[in-house]
Structures are given as C-alpha cells and as structure tokens.
C-alpha cells in the first residue's frame, strides 16, 4: 500500500529498538502481544521483526520460523491440527502458485445468548508451512467475540492478528482511541492482497501481504502487513475458540462469507476445491455452499442457530 511505501525510508536508518511485553496469555499459556494497527512484520532468518507504522522497531520474535531462502514456496502436505478448538474451510495452493488476492464479505450474525468469558476468532486469512509441511503461521483478520485475547467483551469487534504456530503466541493489532466494535447486521469486507517481492536494507527479499478490512468502517478497523520469505500455502476461513461450554455460547445465526474471490498472479484458478478440517471438534457445521475461485460462498452454522 502507498502508506508503507512512504515510510519505507525509515528502515534504512537506525531506529529506536524497544521490546514488547506480553499483555496477556491464552488459557493454554500462549503469550499475546499488542502492536498498533498499520504495523509491519518482516522475516529476518528465523526471526520476525515488528515495526510500528513510523518505522520504529518494536519487537523481535526470535526463532519462530524455519530458515528459508526465496523463492521457496513452503508448499507441502497439510498436517491435521492437534487441537480441539480450531476448525477451518481451506484450499491448498500448488507449489508454483502465488496468491494475488483473497477477498470476501460477511454480515455480522446475531450474538450469543450467553456470555461466560468465551472467546471466538472467526477469521479469514493465509497460512504458511514450515519445512516439514506443518502449519507455521496464520495471518488474518477476524470477527472476534469475547474478550480473553487482549481486547473485546460480550460483543463483536474486528481483529487483525499474526499467529505463530503451533504454540508461539499471537501479535494482535490495536487502534488508539478508536473502538473496532462491530454491530449485528453490519456488512464487512476482508481483503488479503499480495504487494509483490520487496527488498529492505538488512533483510532478504520477501513476499509482502497486506491484510485489512474493507467497507465504510474500514478506517476504524485494524490492518497489518507481513513480509515472509515463503509464500502462503493454505488459504481459507478459520474458527478458533476457547471457553465454549454450551450451544448458547455461539452466535444464534449463521456466519456466511459471500462473494469469495481467490485470485492467483496467473488469474483465477479454473478448478479449486474447498476442504473442511476440524468441524467435529468445534461443533460448528462448515458448509461449502458454492465452490470455486469466483463468487464462492462459505457458511458456518452454529449449534444454537435456530
């Protein structure tokens, strides 16, 4: 995006280096870090370096990725996720595929009827794999309900985050003096866009992706840009939950991702299959209403949906 091209010079000069401290932990003990919306995260060998929008280095996540050199894609077999709190609808890209754009819209569903500190990330994004083919990171934006992950409460907000898999923690993007709260029946768009191969002083060339919300409230919702030396291998919709104990802890209506567009740098794939993983563990019914790469539709039906 133009914003990041403007501040690119900041990476060529010494910047003040600070270190983020975890602002919280998940119930399983994984650390949660916060950075301002618009931050940029770049891979440096096995580390991921976080820069504020003004170019100031905020943090280094050490040894969270395997060492890679471009143009490796990292594409390999999808490993089943060893967790009872995650489900996803996804497609796996080919070894020679580069994701250009992944867009969709959704309408915020009716809220759960009970709140008992449960947490949900209902997200859209991209997953990279490590050298063994196991998931290494997930970059996405989400409809968040609940407040155990730094933000939120018994209401919906828009969240942007980078998750280091399987247990490296989260970087959550936040806005200053702006509430990212979303209301039931709001229509929201999500956009994942390839910015190209970038070169920054002190970093090996990396594949740059911007992930953001779109629509009338986009300025009040978080955004993140991430550069890694490996292309995303998995693209899809993901549910992550904690503290769900009964059907009424879920939204009382379905969440439907519509107008799903998945474009490669070579164009829209003529054949694209969406797969489902982990639905039984979450209790959510994942439905591929319409497949393919153009105008696809993915529906999440919750146990309390009536």
Features from the language model and the residues they span:
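Exposed, interaction-prone regions of secreted/extracellular proteins
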Residues: 20-306
């Amino acid at each position: 995006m133009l914003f990041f091209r403007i501040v690119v010079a900041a990476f060529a000069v010494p910047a003040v280096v600070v270190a983020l401290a975890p602002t919280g932990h998940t119930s399983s003990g994984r650390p949660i870090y916060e950075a301002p919306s618009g931050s940029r995260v770049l891979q440096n060998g096995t580390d991921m370096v976080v820069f504020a929008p003004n170019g100031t280095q905020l943090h280094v996540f050490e040894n969270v990725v395997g060492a890679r050199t471009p143009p490796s894609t990292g594409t390999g077999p999808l490993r089943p996720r060893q967790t009872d709190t995650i489900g996803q609808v996804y497609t796996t890209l080919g070894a020679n595929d580069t994701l250009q754009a992944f867009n969709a819209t959704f309408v915020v569903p009716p809220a759960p009827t009970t709140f008992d500190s449960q947490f949900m990330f209902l997200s859209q994004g991209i997953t990279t794999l490590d050298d063994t083919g196991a998931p290494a990171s997930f970059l996405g934006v989400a409809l968040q309900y609940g407040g155990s992950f730094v933000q939120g409460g018994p209401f919906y907000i828009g969240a942007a985050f980078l998750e280091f898999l399987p247990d490296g923690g989260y970087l959550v993007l936040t806005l200053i003096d702006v509430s990212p709260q979303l209301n039931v029946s709001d229509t929201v768009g999500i956009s994942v866009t390839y910015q190209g191969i970038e070169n920054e002083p002190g970093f090996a060339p990396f594949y740059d992706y911007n992930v953001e919300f779109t629509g009338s409230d986009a300025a009040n919702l978080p955004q993140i840009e991430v550069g890694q030396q490996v292309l995303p291998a998995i693209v899809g919709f993901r549910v992550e939950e904690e503290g769900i104990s009964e059907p009424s802890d879920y939204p009382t209506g379905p969440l439907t991702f519509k107008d799903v567009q998945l474009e490669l740098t070579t164009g829209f794939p003529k054949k694209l299959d969406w797969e489902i993983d982990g639905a039984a563990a979450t209790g959510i019914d994942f439905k591929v209403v319409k497949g393919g790469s153009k105008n696809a539709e993915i529906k999440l039906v919750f146990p309390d949906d009536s």
